[in-house]
UniProtKB/Swiss-Prot annotation:
Purpose: Single-stranded DNA-dependent ATP-dependent helicase that plays a key role in DNA non-homologous end joining (NHEJ) by recruiting DNA-PK to DNA. Required for double-strand break repair and V(D)J recombination. Also has a role in chromosome translocation. Has a role in chromosome translocation. The DNA helicase II complex binds preferentially to fork-like ends of double-stranded DNA in a cell cycle-dependent manner. It works in the 3'-5' direction.
PTM summary: Phosphorylated on serine residues.
Gene Ontology biological process: cellular response to gamma radiation; DNA recombination; double-strand break repair via nonhomologous end joining; negative regulation of DNA-templated transcription; telomere maintenance
Molecular function as annotated in GO: 5'-deoxyribose-5-phosphate lyase activity; ATP binding; damaged DNA binding; DNA helicase activity; hydrolase activity; RNA binding; telomeric DNA binding
Highest classification ranks of the organism: Eukaryota, Metazoa, Chordata, Craniata, Vertebrata
Domain Ku, residue spans: 283-490
Coiled coil (UniProt feature): none
Stretches the record annotates as Disordered: 555-578
Domain (SAP) ranges: 595-629
Record-given protein name: X-ray repair cross-complementing protein 5
Subcellular compartments: Nucleus; Chromosome
GO CC entries: chromosome; Ku70:Ku80 complex; nonhomologous end joining complex; nucleoplasm; ribonucleoprotein complex
Length: 632
């Protein structure tokens, strides 16, 4: 099938309508403010990008502490809105300790009798200043949970409805200003079940709107985490003019009020973890038309946090520094004293740093449209590495969202994918990628579960394809196939990625939490990957036995060990493996320095054939063969 060039689909990007993330919050979310620098990406099928960002995240939990927040839900197992809020904040604290302990968190109450803040505003109490999360801070939050916590809170702080939300926002702004370190993101999360706090005081309502506008102008994001209340929570009464709505969100879609911890945590995590672009670049539809996009990881493998080296005498963190010395004289070498070299034809070819950078530079970063193909032409075996996600970046080029939406809608309508040449950043080789369109999805509470945009699927080069020799198997007959179909049908279930947690990671995090909070023993993580054998047996009934009778011989015993079949000529088996490469070809490879073109398997067989050591890395095999043939 011929490739479509930029025709009807491409021209449709000139007219469009507007449009509306979830990311993993483990590892790599909280670097030091000193760690400035460009984002860098590892290449390769198993590579996971490791990026550095300047500044720290900061988050203030602004909690309504009025009496209404302490009234229990009717016919609900959950306690009060305040209890649910404190549990949610505690969960964020523990996750931050694990994933990004350099971030700054704070808890501020309003609507109470007592007050404690730098400006001495009435009925506003700063429980915790902006600081790193830690065990002591979590234990302090735990004091105010449950029935005993509510009693302690009432006795310690009391309640008073004569507060000013504008002054509460002002107090939060002062907390950000008092921080000495550099802040990359500043966010306030407001927890309340009161949808019109200043219904009878227009002056306070006006002050709150003014302060919210000031926060917006200074780059502070205000998010509303509204909680369930009798009669429902109406955002339009007051908070629609107060809260921030991100540029990539639909003004008409707001999440429903939260009456359960699970729903509240889902909203908080979606807001708390900022959308970090792996790169921001242009997508060129042709040489004269382009728009800017951001590239993101929707899913990234979670790792255990890196261990920190400590000095054994004081338990203080230590920093590792690397120095390069001359092997002959022992003198210290500066970066300008070293070069990179490539062995080719038994010669070391040295290159300057500028030359190596020039060799790696193919073109300027960006996505360059090649054409369009039907979605049906993308096959499962084209997968070569994890995909990325593309979303418009309006802040760089005005009008990018409009062009992006037009392209997305037209690709969805025609069921096509866009093929592009993709260079993520300088000094990375180009890749051929497919842009797969995706519609936006929201759940019953109008929380986004799938963002609109394009998945970037990396396609293999011709060099990446392998020819695998498959041994011929005994084909199954129709009766055996039908019986297996029945087994598969009985064991089918709806798969959801968020239903299975990594048991090793979960247990590791629980162990860390137990150590940090001085627990007697860590909570045991449930391994959700273990098959439910009893449920499977109940579903299958006699199908397994019937399948065994169809496939295995009558005297088959699964516990018995299969006897090794002896073949004629085993005693005369060759000790050395046969190799398909002639000695002359090997000499040519050695002389030209091109042994690296051979696979590791071929190199190992060749080494064994000539009685050389066949273990170790590929370079060691190449060195052994080079030394062997150079001496003959």
């Amino acid at each position: 099938m011929e490739m479509w060039v930029l025709g009807e689909v491409g021209m449709a990007v000139l007219s469009a309508a507007a449009m509306a993330d979830w990311v993993s919050y483990y590892r790599g979310d909280g670097p030091d403010e000193e760690e400035d620098g460009e984002q860098q990406e590892e290449e390769g099928p198993e590579a996971v990008a490791d990026y550095r960002f300047s500044g720290r995240d900061s988050l203030i939990f602004l909690v309504d502490a009025s009496k209404a927040m302490f009234e229990p839900y009717e016919n609900e197992e959950a306690a009060t809105p305040f209890d649910m809020t404190m549990q949610c904040i505690r969960n964020v604290y523990t996750s931050k300790i694990i994933s990004s302990d350099k971030d700054l968190l704070s808890v501020v109450f309003y609507g109470m009798e007592n007050n404690k803040n730098s400006a001495d505003f009435k009925h506003i109490y700063v429980l915790q200043e902006l600081d790193n999360p830690g065990a002591k801070r979590i234990l302090e939050l735990d004091q105010y949970r449950g029935d005993e916590g509510r009693v302690l809170f009432r006795e310690t702080f009391g309640h008073n409805a004569d507060y000013s939300l504008g002054e509460a926002l002002w107090a939060c702004s002062n907390l950000f200003s008092d921080v000495r370190v550099r802040l990359s993101h500043k966010r306030i999360m407001l927890f309340t079940n009161e949808d019109n706090p200043h219904a009878n005081d227009s002056a306070k309502a006006k002050l709150a709107r003014t302060r919210a506008g000031d926060l917006r102008d200074t780059g502070i994001i205000l998010d509303l985490m509204h909680l369930k209340k009798p009669g429902g929570f109406d955002i339009s009464l007051f908070y629609r003019d107060i809260i921030n709505v991100a540029e990539d969100e639909d003004l008409g879609i707001q999440p429903d009020e939260s009456g359960k911890l699970e729903h509240l945590m889902k909203k908080v995590r979606a807001k708390e973890t900022r959308k970090r672009a792996l790169s921001r670049l242009n997508l060129y539809l042709n040489k004269d038309l382009s728009f800017s996009v951001g590239v993101y990881n929707l899913i990234q493998k979670a790792y255990k946090p890196y261990p920190v080296k400590l000095y054994r005498e004081t338990n203080e963190p230590v920093k590792t520094k690397t120095r390069v010395f001359n092997g002959k004289t022992g003198s210290l070498l500066l970066p300008s004293d070293t070069k990179r070299a490539q062995t080719y034809g038994n010669r070391q070819i040295a290159m300057e740093k500028e030359e190596t950078e020039e060799v790696k530079r193919f073109d300027s970063p960006g996505l360059f449209l090649i054409g369009f193909k039907p979605l049906s032409m993308l096959k499962q075996h084209h997968h070569i590495r994890p995909s990325q996600f593309m979303y418009p970046e309006e802040s760089l080029v005005t009008g990018s969202t409009t062009l992006f939406n037009a392209l997305l809608m037209k690709c969805l309508e025609k069921e096509v994918m866009a093929l592009c040449r993709y260079i993520a950043r300088r000094n990375t080789p180009p890749r051929i990628v497919a842009l797969i369109p995706q519609e936006e999805e929201v759940d019953e509470q109008k929380v986004q579960i799938a963002p609109p945009g394009f998945h970037i699927i990396f396609l293999p080069y011709a060099d990446d394809k392998r020819n695998v020799d498959f041994t011929e198997k005994v084909p199954a007959n129709r009766e055996q196939v039908d019986k297996m179909k029945g087994i598969i049908q009985k064991l089918r279930f709806k798969y959801r990625t968020d239903s299975f947690e990594n048991p090793v990671l979960q247990q590791h995090f629980r162990n860390l939490e137990a150590l940090a909070l001085d627990m007697l023993e860590p909570e045991q993580a449930e391994d959700l990957t273990m098959p439910k054998t009893e449920e499977m047996s109940r579903r299958l009934g006699n199908l397994v036995e019937e399948f065994k009778q169809l496939v295995y011989p009558p005297d088959y015993s699964p516990e018995g060990k299969a006897a090794k079949r002896k073949q004629a000529g085993d005693a005369q088996a060759e000790k050395r493996p046969k190799i398909e490469i002639s000695e002359d070809s090997l000499r040519s490879y050695v002389q030209n320095g091109t042994l690296g073109k051979l696979t590791v398997s071929a190199l190992k067989d060749t080494c064994r054939h000539y009685g050389l050591r066949s273990g170790g890395k590929k370079q060691e095999l190449i060195d052994a063969l080079t030394e062997y043939f150079s001496g003959r």
